[in-house]
Every structure is written in structure tokens, then in C-alpha cells.
Amino acid sequence: NLYQFGNMIQCTIPGSNPLL
């Protein structure tokens, strides 16, 4: 789950990562 990592990079969608 990339929720925590996504949150660090200002990801508004749980489990979603802009870098991916």
C-alpha cells in the first residue's frame, strides 16, 4: 500500500501514487 508514501508527496487519493 502506497498510502503513506503517496500522502508524503501530496497524494489526495488513498493508495495512489502520481509517480507511478
From Swiss-Prot:
Residue intervals passing through the bilayer: none
E.C. code: 3.1.1.4
Note whether Metal-binding occurs among the keywords. yes
* Tissues expressing the protein: Expressed by the venom gland.
**Compartments, record wording:** Secreted
Write out the similarity annotation: Belongs to the phospholipase A2 family. Group I subfamily.
Protein name, as recorded: Phospholipase A2 D5
